[in-house]
């Protein structure tokens, strides 16, 4: 074999690597902007670019010493570094959540392990003032061997962590050749079973640092805040000792502390009346470490984080994490994400009210944390550890006790893995210790608990007692063993039901409660942000959480004929072991277009909320949910009064001032119209310029329904008002049909269904297909479990059959009463319905439907009617909740208004097609082509959905680019829909959002019309 089998040896994790140290970028002189532009340093030589590359399906196919000087790489391809080889067309993409993609046989991996050989030639100029050279790999999946100029340099693993080698004696002046052999898997892969696409290669930057012989090797900064000053402690270690001038400057370049250091040890500096860093004002000081031939510039902060009485305090303020779980993921470059991609993520997060990020489930590139320092995010830094696969092993006895015990004993509680687990935790802490955004060290994810994590926590707490520790998987253990949890600061949970949280707070509550993952954001959802927000803010021991997750993971291929990008998920590349579209669970699409769930989060976590509005006194009470800023310093509050969606009054709220976490009252004098649906909308706009967010950016809103004499929507009232003129409707009837002929209309009702099959008005047929009673919706990702019950009840095959009908007529119109049932093959009648149709002389159709569902059956997906309208009816105008989709539990980002949209724009294009585009709490909707249309209105609000896609097509189609349009504009008018929730990986839909009624009534009016 061409290399020693370190990749299957738990006793060899690294060879010839440097001890872990803090990340920094040195230069020959002071350079302040080396966070996002580190390539500007004259002491950092990037080796990124086009490398020679050959992919091998098996290590046994690597027969030539490709790393030797003079080896002919003419048969090699070229590949971009950094990058992953799957994105370059080699190997096969694979997405799996828990299951290992290879047999569980540690420390061994498949014998025919795929690998990639990299070769790159570069020019190197030696620097007499920086004669040392250190080769850095910031990310290689899964392990690698490296040679320079034919000479073996070393070996390393831990995919998401830096491997550094001293190559001073190997590099030569002029041309040099580096060769790297990367293995797809290694023993470390058992610890890298994260829920993501599995990709391989040199996926982060490769560079050489030029260093003086006498230079700082490592430094550590800690700060403590006293009464009117801060102490900055600097621990230094050197390769060889040298005099170092230490300077600390404030944001304006004013020196606030300085001194000298010449040897290993600790040095303390004072900052008088320091400005503390926080997420609303990320104030950084500049630290300059200047020696004879080198300068290191760092940006440091002064801040505190502590737990008192089971409550987290940041700079002395009670704090909640408004966080999100973030993977490195890009649909084109995979794991490789550069500064600009990270900055785009951080910008969107800031714009949508996040203040914290969990680096799920591995350390990010080191500059990510510098950017979080700069832009104001708290970070939970997570070790590159997930050993979830043993949870899926075969067990004869599949009980929780046995499942957790078997999971636990394989790795977490197996001393053979101690060195590997501690190595990963220590390397993370050592590299990232100077990043003040990091408030929490996480030992990893979903790896169970045992002696190895006890030791990792003990080392972390001893080394860095200034930060919080968390490890959610501590709860998965061998129940026969007593473990030590004293070094674990938080009680962390994933996706708990609200009742479970309440129980913990009531019966235990010994540690702050962290929702380390919650509100699974897969597809259309989540629908429970507001409910978790209320829980988080109900108790100071609740310290917030991290939504799962930031982005949909997908691989972008070419464009379909309809212009849509073909995004592939699990199974689309032919892989046998995969988890389908479970990777499509983000708040943004792969290209970072926001999901409606992101908008929902933003408004739920708005910085200010209305507590109450005394309309009679004109007194508004507000609560400040910010941690550090007064309302008056952070936001401008603008108000608007609307009547049936039209603006009638605007202005600015003046004098609102409330300290963090407190209330204020302020006068607001407005005129309330006597008729119409009248809403007061308050918009919270950023007052000051923030990093990444401009002044004037809207951070959220509140709306309040105001009381008046006639609160009906006046347009809806006109649509629903019956024509009292004498009508002349002729009724024709046979065994199958009832035909109504009026002045300018002919309606055809099918006696077999009790529903209309034709609506001809002003010479045009409005229905392309018969009307239906509708109980099915294309299952959302969050319906994945209840879907089985729905299909067991055959809701997806339901149709309507009528039993009897009765016609009554008077001078004002015709009434048709039908007794019908919603039925499906092989099961009992689903719903018994009584339908009453009232048709007046103007052609207006008033409907009243009384429904009784069989109590044995599961909650309904929805109930309403579905109409297949003339496709030329392509424009929608509606009064209800918009402009984005809204549901009974997912409508906090929507507001009441009069909205206009094309039918095409009403479709929310989830990559896995599903129910979408509904609008909640509507008074009316009109579908038109400007010349004629159909209006639906009601005295009691309803939901509607207008689309070119049927629910059948949405149910059956696996990708959005494969969707086929119907020949109609499909209009669904719903009495109700089941809630959205987050049950794809969370609790069931809350009771108050379930469509659990067994008896209900639905009234609405259909009005065909012609403009002009």
Which residues does each PLM region occupy?
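Extended acidic/polar, glycine-enriched regions
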Residues: 172-175, 237-308, 678-716, 720, ...
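Accessory beta-strand-rich segments of carbohydrate-active enzymes
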Residues: 2-15, 37-38, 52-56, 84-92, ...
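Extended substrate-binding grooves/exosites of carbohydrate-active enzymes
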Residues: 1-39, 96-98, 190, 294-621, ...
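Intrinsically disordered, low-complexity Pro/Gly/Ser/Thr-rich segments with frequent PxxP/GP/PP motifs
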Residues: 260-272, 645-675
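Surface beta-strand/loop "capping" patches
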Residues: 213-240, 595-635, 720-735, 849
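An acidic-aromatic loop/edge-strand motif
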Residues: 84-87, 92, 99-108, 157-159, ...
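Glycine/proline-rich low-complexity spacer/linker segments in large multi-domain proteins
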Residues: 2-26, 31-38, 153-154, 177-210, ...
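Beta-strand/loop-rich accessory regions of lumenal/periplasmic or secreted enzymes
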Residues: 87-89, 184, 278, 669-676, ...
């Amino acid at each position: 074999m061409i290399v020693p089998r370190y990749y299957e040896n738990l006793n060899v994790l690294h060879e010839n690597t440097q001890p872990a140290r803090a990340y920094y970028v040195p230069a020959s002189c002071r350079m302040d902007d080396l966070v996002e532009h580190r390539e500007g340093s004259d002491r950092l030589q990037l080796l990124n670019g086009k490398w020679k590359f050959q992919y091998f399906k098996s290590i046994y196919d690597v027969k030539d010493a490709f790393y030797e000087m003079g080896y002919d790489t003419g048969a090699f391809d070229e590949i971009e570094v950094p990058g992953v080889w799957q994105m370059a067309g080699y190997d096969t993409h694979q997405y799996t959540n828990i299951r290992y993609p290879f047999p569980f046989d540690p420390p061994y991996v498949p014998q025919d392990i795929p690998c990639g050989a990299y070769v790159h030639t570069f020019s190197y100029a030696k620097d007499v003032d920086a004669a040392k050279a250190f080769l850095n790999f910031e990310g290689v999946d899964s392990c690698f061997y490296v040679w320079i100029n034919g000479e073996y340099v070393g070996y390393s693993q831990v995919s998401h962590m830096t491997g550094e080698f001293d190559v001073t004696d190997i590099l030569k002046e002029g041309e040099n050749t580096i060769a790297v052999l990367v293995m797809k898997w290694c023993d470390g892969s058992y610890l890298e079973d994260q829920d993501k696409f599995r990709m391989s290669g040199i996926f982060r930057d490769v560079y050489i640092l030029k260093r003086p012989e006498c230079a700082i090797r490592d430094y550590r900064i800690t700060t403590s805040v006293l009464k009117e000053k801060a102490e900055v402690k600097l621990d230094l270690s050197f390769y060889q000792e040298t005099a170092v001038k230490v300077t600390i400057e404030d944001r304006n370049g004013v020196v606030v502390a300085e001194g000298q250091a010449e040897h290993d040890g600790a040095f303390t500096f004072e900052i008088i009346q320091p400005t503390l860093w926080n997420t609303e004002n990320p104030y950084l000081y500049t630290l300059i470490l200047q020696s004879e031939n080198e300068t290191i510039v760092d940006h440091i902060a002064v801040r505190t984080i502590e737990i008192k009485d089971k409550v987290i305090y940041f700079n002395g303020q009670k704090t909640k994490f408004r966080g999100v779980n973030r993977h490195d993921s890009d649909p084109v470059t995979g794991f490789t994400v550069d500064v600009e991609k990270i900055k785009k993520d951080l910008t969107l997060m800031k714009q949508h009210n996040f203040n914290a990020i969990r680096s799920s489930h591995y350390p990010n590139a080191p500059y990510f944390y510098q950017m979080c320092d700069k832009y104001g995010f708290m970070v939970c830094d997570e070790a590159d550890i997930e050993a979830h696969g043993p949870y899926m092993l075969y067990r004869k006895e599949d009980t929780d006790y046995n499942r957790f015990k078997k999971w636990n004993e394989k790795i977490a509680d197996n001393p053979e893995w101690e060195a590997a687990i501690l190595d990963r935790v220590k390397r993370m802490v050592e590299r990232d210790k100077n990043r003040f955004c990091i408030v929490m060290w996480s030992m990893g994810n979903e790896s169970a608990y045992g002696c190895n994590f006890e030791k990792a926590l003990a080392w972390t707490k001893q080394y860095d007692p200034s930060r919080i520790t968390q490890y959610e998987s501590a709860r998965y253990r061998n129940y026969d063993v007593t473990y030590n949890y004293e070094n674990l600061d938080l009680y962390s949970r994933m996706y708990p039901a609200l009742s479970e949280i309440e129980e913990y707070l009531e019966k235990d509550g010994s540690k702050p409660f962290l929702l380390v993952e919650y509100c699974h954001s897969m597809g259309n959802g989540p629908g429970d942000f507001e409910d978790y927000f209320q829980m988080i803010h109900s108790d100071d021991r609740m310290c917030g959480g991290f939504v799962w997750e930031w982005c949909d993971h997908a691989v972008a291929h070419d464009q379909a004929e309809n212009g849509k990008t073909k995004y592939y998920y699990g199974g689309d590349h032919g892989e046998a072991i995969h988890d389908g579209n479970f990777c499509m669970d983000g708040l943004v699409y792969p290209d970072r277009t926001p999901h409606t769930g992101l908008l929902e989060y933003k408004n739920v976590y708005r910085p200010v909320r209305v507590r109450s509005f005394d309309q009679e006194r004109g007194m508004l009470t507000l609560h400040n949910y910010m941690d550090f800023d007064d309302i008056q310093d952070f936001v401008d509050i603008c108000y608007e009064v609307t009547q049936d969606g039209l603006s009638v009054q605007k202005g600015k709220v003046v004098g609102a001032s409330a300290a963090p976490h407190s209330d204020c009252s302020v006068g607001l004098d407005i005129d309330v119209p006597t008729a119409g649906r009248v809403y007061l909308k308050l918009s919270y706009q950023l007052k000051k310029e923030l990093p990444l967010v401009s002044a004037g950016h809207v951070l959220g809103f509140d709306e309040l329904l105001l009381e008046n004499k006639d609160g009906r929507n006046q347009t809806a009232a006109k649509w629903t008002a019956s024509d009292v003129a004498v009508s002349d409707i002729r009724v024709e009837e046979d065994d199958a049909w009832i035909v109504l002929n009026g002045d300018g209309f002919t309606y055809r009702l099918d006696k077999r269904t009790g529903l209309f099959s034709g609506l001809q008005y002003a010479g045009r047929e409005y229905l392309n297909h018969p009307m239906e009673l509708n109980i099915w919706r294309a299952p959302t990702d969050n319906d994945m479990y209840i879907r089985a019950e729905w299909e067991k009840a055959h809701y997806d095959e339901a149709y309507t059959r009528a039993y009897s009908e009765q016609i009554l007529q008077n001078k004002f119109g015709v009434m048709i009463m039908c007794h019908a049932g919603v039925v499906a093959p092989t099961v009992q009648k689903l719903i018994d319905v009584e339908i009453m149709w009232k048709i007046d002389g103007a052609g207006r159709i008033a409907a009243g439907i009384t429904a009784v569902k069989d109590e044995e059956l599961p909650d309904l997906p929805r109930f309403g009617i579905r109409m297949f309208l003339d496709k030329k009816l392509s424009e929608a105008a509606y009064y209800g909740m918009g402009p984005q989709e809204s549901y009974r539990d997912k409508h906090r980002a929507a507001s009441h208004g009069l909205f206009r949209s094309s039918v095409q724009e009403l479709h929310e294009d989830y990559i896995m097609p599903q129910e979408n585009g509904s609008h909640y709490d509507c008074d009316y909707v009109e579908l038109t082509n400007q010349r004629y249309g159909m209006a639906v209105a009601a005295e009691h609000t309803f939901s509607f959905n207008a689309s070119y896609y049927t629910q059948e097509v949405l149910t059956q189609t696996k990708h959005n680019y494969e969707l086929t349009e119907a020949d109609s504009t499909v209009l669904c008018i719903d009495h109700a829909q089941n809630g959205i929730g987050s049950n794809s990986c969370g609790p069931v839909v809350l009771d108050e959002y379930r469509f659990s009624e067994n008896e209900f009534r639905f009234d609405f009016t259909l009005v065909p019309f012609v403009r002009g």
